[in-house]
């Protein structure tokens, strides 16, 4: 099946590609579109997810230019009828072929960083286990906007490293403060981790929620259902009130998510 860029995001995606190509120049190896745009369908608050693969580290000038100019092309979720939030991850090819564990990413742009970027604060290159999951998803479903198809560039991560990457976020969410402000995203991420470890496959956030809901006690199902409804743009939730329920859901999920692929 030949995938194509959804018409609703084509102009914004092409503008982002032109910017990335101009700034990275001869170091650019590939740009891939992945995520909801090509697998599961765009939802009201879905990002446009781009992976940029380069052959040389970014200079500080390149990093600053990308961060600042991506701000103008991106919009916070739900804030604009014309633009979506961009999530742009930049990685060195040498981190992925051959695999380094954990791999490092050169740069990541996302709307959650907008305030820092506006102040000229840019994250440096850093290790990121999520790169293993990202490449796994791209190998399953993606569109090459520049360069070769994913299966010609990348190789799958070994199962043991994929398992480590899937379970790594579970150690990050230890307290109420760790989940506050990102409640529905964390709840849906846990559903996706649960789905993948149980089935060996990746799926969209709302599909993972649909799969998990019938298996949960009602108290926990209600929290997941609330997160799913906000993600789908059906109902805005008051997460300040729901925070204790979210913490209980996180604790329950961490206790019941498989420790191995089943």
UniProtKB/Swiss-Prot annotation:
Purpose of the protein: Mediates bacterial resistance to the antibiotics streptomycin and spectinomycin, does not confer resistance to kanamycin. Binds ATP first, then antibiotic.
Alphabetical keyword list: Antibiotic resistance, ATP-binding, Magnesium, Metal-binding, Nucleotide-binding, Nucleotidyltransferase, Transferase
Active-site residues (renumbered): 87
Residues annotated to bind streptomycin: 173-178, 185
One MF term in the entry's GO annotations: aminoglycoside 3''-adenylyltransferase activity
Species of provenance: Salmonella typhimurium (strain LT2 / SGSC1412 / ATCC 700720)
Positions annotated to bind ATP: 36, 46-47, 130, 205, 231
Protein name per UniProt: Aminoglycoside (3'') (9) adenylyltransferase
InterPro entries tied to this protein: AadA/Aad9, AadA_C, NT_sf, Polymerase_NTP_transf_dom
Coiled coil: none
Species classification: Bacteria, Pseudomonadati, Pseudomonadota, Gammaproteobacteria, Enterobacterales
EC number assigned by the record: 2.7.7.47
Source taxon at top rank: Bacteria
One record GO biological process: response to antibiotic
Key word NAD present: no
